[in-house]
Design a protein with these regions (language model features):
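Peripheral interaction segments used for macromolecular assembly
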Residues: 1-197
Length: 197
């Protein structure tokens, strides 16, 4: 029943609406990921109230994901009601990555193109990588040209700390330096030596 309920809202209906858990305002829906495959877009972007960010995040972030499955209904006053508690939202926010002081859910990172700071496409994120129950990196399927030019495997890991920003409209995530420099980072070297959990 709950599932049917939230299937019927599209992002246009939810944009700029305030989100509540009971009487607590969590934030405002500001959009969602630009991805050609709608089924892949499982989260919306929410601008989080600063008191909520302070209380429910390890380190406050202004923008965070809101899983679509948590949307229960639109109330009579036009606000969005969530089906779960703040505790559940907090749990979801712990399961994110932080880039440029914004939080991203794993589903928002998958399939994103990875570019270096010169605009060269390195490859596409296939999944995220955890160390001690925390996402520390992404697994990237590299482009053929990159494999040839840099003698790298068809899959490699890039640490989250190597990213400087995302480009929402283009569904890209951008490295803070050239790919050549990324390959020399101690964090890059160590993450590629670790066994996956």
């Amino acid at each position: 029943m709950g599932k049917m309920k939230n299937e019927k809202y599209n992002i246009q209906e939810l944009l700029q609406r305030d989100v509540y858990v009971n009487d607590k305002k969590v934030g405002t829906i500001v959009g969602e990921r630009h991805h050609p495959n709608e089924a892949r877009v499982r989260s919306m972007r929410i601008q989080v109230e600063s008191d909520v960010a302070d209380e429910y995040m390890r380190k406050p972030a202004e923008l965070a994901p809101l899983p679509k499955e948590l949307v229960h209904s639109i109330r009579n006053d036009g606000t969005v009601k969530l089906s779960k508690s703040m505790r559940e939202l907090q749990r979801r926010w712990r399961n994110t990555v932080r880039i440029d002081e914004k939080l991203y859910a794993p589903d928002e990172m998958q399939d994103r193109a990875v570019l270096d700071n010169q605009g060269r496409e390195i490859g596409v994120i296939t999944k995220l990588f955890k160390i001690k129950r925390t996402y520390k990196g992404v697994i990237v399927k590299t482009r053929l040209g990159i494999q040839k030019d840099f003698a790298v495997e068809d899959e490699l890991r890039i640490p989250i700390t190597a990213f400087s920003r995302t480009r929402e409209r283009l569904d890209e995530v951008v490295l803070s330096r050239t790919f050549e420099k990324v390959l020399q980072l101690p964090s890059y070297i160590s993450i590629n030596e670790i066994n996956e959990e």
